Amino acid sequence: METRAAENTAIFMCKCCNLFSPNQSELLSHVSEKHMEEGVNVDEIIIPLRPLSTPEPPNSSKTGDEFLVMKRKRGRPKGSTKKSSTEEELAENIVSPTEDSPLAPEEGNSLPPSSLECSKCCRKFSNTRQLRKHICIIVLNLGEEEGEAGNESDLELEKKCKEDDREKASKRPRSQKTEKVQKISGKEARQLSGAKKPIISVVLTAHEAIPGATKIVPVEAGPPETGATNSETTSADLVPRRGYQEYAIQQTPYEQPMKSSRLGPTQLKIFTCEYCNKVFKFKHSLQAHLRIHTNEKPYKCPQCSYASAIKANLNVHLRKHTGEKFACDYCSFTCLSKGHLKVHIERVHKKIKQHCRFCKKKYSDVKNLIKHIRDAHDPQDKKVKEALDELCLMTREGKRQLLYDCHICERKFKNELDRDRHMLVHGDKWPFACELCGHGATKYQALELHVRKHPFVYVCAVCRKKFVSSIRLRTHIKEVHGAAQEALVFTSSINQSFCLLEPGGDIQQEALGDQLQLVEEEFALQGVNALKEEACPGDTQLEEGRKEPEAPGEMPAPAVHLASPQAESTALPPCELETTVVSSSDLHSQEVVSDDFLLKNDTSSAEAHAAPEKPPDMQHRSSVQTQGEVITLLLSKAQSAGSDQESHGAQSPLGEGQNMAVLSAGDPDPSRCLRSNPAEASDLLPPVAGGGDTITHQPDSCKAAPEHRSGITAFMKVLNSLQKKQMNTSLCERIRKVYGDLECEYCGKLFWYQVHFDMHVRTHTREHLYYCSQCHYSSITKNCLKRHVIQKHSNILLKCPTDGCDYSTPDKYKLQAHLKVHTALDKRSYSCPVCEKSFSEDRLIKSHIKTNHPEVSMSTISEVLGRRVQLKGLIGKRAMKCPYCDFYFMKNGSDLQRHIWAHEGVKPFKCSLCEYATRSKSNLKAHMNRHSTEKTHLCDMCGKKFKSKGTLKSHKLLHTADGKQFKCTVCDYTAAQKPQLLRHMEQHVSFKPFRCAHCHYSCNISGSLKRHYNRKHPNEEYANVGTGELAAEVLIQQGGLKCPVCSFVYGTKWEFNRHLKNKHGLKVVEIDGDPKWETATEAPEEPSTQYLHITEAEEDVQGTQAAVAALQDLRYTSESGDRLDPTAVNILQQIIELGAETHDATALASVVAMAPGTVTVVKQVTEEEPSSNHTVMIQETVQQASVELAEQHHLVVSSDDVEGIETVTVYTQGGEASEFIVYVQEAMQPVEEQAVEQPAQEL
């Protein structure tokens, strides 16, 4: 041993435990303590490790990473022993150790870590053995040359398999590693002499060997020609690189709209590596590949210093510490990877070989065969090239550059499975289609997950068709069943609709508890009655079925029979029960399918639905499954017809309890028992023509039950498996009160605010309003665009605040998820209650249960996570009830807080300059503008400045074409907003009930007077010294408008109409000359106008008398005989003759009932020349107005000679002289004690 130590020994190693030491005495003491009991010689355990010797000592520039890969001698080689010139040159230039001193197995450990790095791709290795087997260093494996790999050891097979699964590292240019001197062949020197040329584009070419496939071919940039180009490239290199390039392949849009509301992706993204120009279809594969170039190894072993760039490799490594291995069933081979075991069985035991088509050689894997064909055969040959293309598709590298095409729409897909699923889109029917929204799925599991997203199923009470939202249900009723009885049909349909959410789901038990309790009690009562009548004999049951139910909630159960003998003996899942109301004459010609939803229990369908055959006389009796939990009630066609014929005329045929239901006898929750209630629809259907008997008919679906049940759609299978709650109108109103009344037509989701609703609808319509200015990205919301710009086009990185953690990301949500790793709370593990699989994060187990175990309830998930979990977003955002009243507000919203402050009398936002206080921060900000003289908002069109942004926005409307759309009918004033016009109309009013006590200011509303006090008399107390309430006669004379319901007084008809609509919900409608008050169900901006035409009589006097009588009827219409205010009601304006003589009636025109604020065109009836001065005066005025005045101008003509008429106002409307507008103002009799002369006023 001393002799061995004398020969330039640098380090000693313990062979048993791989312990190294430069001192031999330390190892001797170690062996004596640890390994003496093993009975081995010390010289055999301690071995010296000598440094590598070099044949060229003067050359000091050689580094330790240049090794000779020793060829393994396994006997006489087969075939030619001729070696390629490249291999000979490389072997000559690689330093070889002395032949008399063979390398020890672990001698690479004596080298520094920097020497265990590949000089070509800069990849580092932990020992010399791995470096020798690296693909950049190895010259040629003798086993591959021989074409046989069956004699290799298992360890070598594992390493080779590992190399097959790992992507090959790219070759770095020599210019990046100038400190290393390498002696390589001239061919490889030319390959590595320059950097990789950047990819400038990607070309898609049709694959020659595979039809329907496209190959991605990257196009590299050409060599630089001028110095300017070089300078540009150099400046571009200074910009930090992402490491990859992203390319978007535009997808061909669909020619026809898809059945689903969601559109397919418009782009297909692929990626290329900037270091080695490899093409990747998936970004996660690219990110794992980039870690090879960046030497990033984020996955570290907690028990040793091992680190890897791929998480799967770390999982394999951890099995070294846990001892978990995969064992071969045929031999004693064990390995850490399941894939390695599979390769071992194929190579060693199954003897699977890859044969060359052009020679007799065989290879153990496809990669070696491809290498052989490229080296030994001509790749330019057509047959060789086709064989290479076919073999490349069997490798991961070959599939990486392949896309799959749809031959119909030319859309492209990244894998063949997606393409095959897409082909179903072009078929007549989707294999897994949602019947509510038209969404199509290619897998049953995907359809099942999709249907669970629909909170409600709305069912038409007439045709039993299902809809996803009440909007589509209402539209369907209008278009198909007519709008005559729309309200009744819609109400009945709501009562037969269902909620698909289970208890504890998205519906609040607190908010909807009362309604849900009523529904559950109703179902419980129905279930008890059904079970009682089910146990009765068939004859008694038929007799009882003819009786009227004693209570509204009681629904007698019908007789039950089995549809067919095949259904009796075959176990089948529950099917759709169908009910149609038709006439007996159309019994065989009209069949409308309708579906009842049945609750599918967890019990076996064979036990629940299968029954032994019964004789015909026993089929009318019910089949009660005493041991099962599900009782299915089926109504036969013959019995339903017979029962209806016997009871016809006594009661409604559908109101006799002939309902179909599925009752769960063992279910403690009676609300889960569902029923169909067509009784409510019986009154909604029109009577049958011809007096035929109306019966309940069951179509052929139940007559041929086995065929129908076997052909049940996937959607109905999913729907039958879900728990349901039947809805009613009160529950529906309660839900909308909690979640909002804005309903999405496409998915049925509810919203409170219009802005949120509009944003959500764009997710269905795919309307992108926000576009990125730096790329082709577009988004639905502004926040998504902002997030995109931060992540993609900015260098902002958010770093983890934890000490010692270098994690950084541009996405704040990813940072929040990362921070959970450092918290002790989230380090707990969660176990799945079904498969007992463990997860480290709560989001992972929730996603796992949702995907694999959708039947698990929310309460079970809440128990697993230790906190309450709810399904969010299915219906919408919940509202919270005010603790002081019954109003609902958005949860955690500012409206709720302000509302509570209003109850408590709190105004937290106070002005620091005065005593003003408010509950809104925005109101305080607007108030502070009064104390400031600075105007910071500038109009860019006229230069005018304003204090607030809202005022500037209103001002800019004046510069638009249709900005001033509110026009005064008295003068030429126009306003951009309606409140401004209402404020302007105050100056045209003679009676103003609000008056200032300190000046002559008066107004029509209290708000204007308060504003006047704040601006003109800020130190005075508000006081109204107006006349207040006056008598009806005084109000009529002064032109004021007094509400006939309450005591409020208004000076304008606009304020009066708004008061009626807001306070009393009323509007005035003239019907046949009789003014009536009606409830204002709809309040449009402009009241409707009704027309009353008085035809000219044979004698002119009769026509004049009829017109005057119609006017007088309006003045005295109340039963008490009191005169009504002519402007308080909707006055019937008439154009009557202005003279008492008979010839004055020749100018009689249409009589029009005009609502306040409307514009009506009256066409002149006659053009005869009247002799009355008054008539001539009006006609001349009309002619003058039509010629000289423009649109919306008017003239006021007054005459003191006409009794009962004070003023006539003529408006022009267009260029034709025969079209004008006339307002007639009656002359008011002056009050005796108060003779005030009133000016002409327009109504």
From Swiss-Prot:
On the tree of life, the source organism's domain of life is Eukaryota
Q: Which Pfam families match?
A: zf-C2H2, zf-H2C2_5
Q: Which InterPro entries match?
A: Zinc_finger/UBP_domain, Znf_C2H2_sf, Znf_C2H2_type
In which tissues or organs does this protein occur? Isoform 1 is strongly expressed in placenta, spleen, kidney, testis and peripheral blood leukocytes. Expressed in CD4+ and CD8+ T-cells, CD19+ B-cells and CB14+ monocytes. Isoform 3 is strongly expressed in placenta, ovary, tonsil, CD19+ B-cells and CD14+ monocytes.
Query: Carries keyword DNA-binding?
Result: yes
Q: Which UniProt keywords apply?
A: Cytoplasm, DNA-binding, Metal-binding, Nucleus, Repeat, Transcription, Transcription regulation, Zinc, Zinc-finger
Annotated residues for binding of Zn(2+) 2? 301, 304, 317, 321
Gene3D superfamilies found in the cross-reference section: Classic Zinc Finger (3.30.160.60)
The segment annotated Disordered runs over: 51-116, 147-189, 534-570, 603-625, 638-705
Name of the molecule in the record:
Zinc finger protein ZFAT
- According to its UniProt record, where is this protein mainly located? nucleus
Q: Where is the composition biased (Basic residues)?
A: 70-81
Q: Which residues bind Zn(2+) 1?
A: 273, 276, 289, 293
Positions annotated to bind Zn(2+) 8: 800, 805, 818, 822
Instruction: Tell me the GO molecular function terms.
Output: DNA-binding transcription activator activity, RNA polymerase II-specific; DNA-binding transcription factor activity, RNA polymerase II-specific; RNA polymerase II cis-regulatory region sequence-specific DNA binding; zinc ion binding
Q: Which GO terms describe its cellular component?
A: cytosol; nucleus
Binding-site positions, Zn(2+) 10: 882, 885, 899, 903
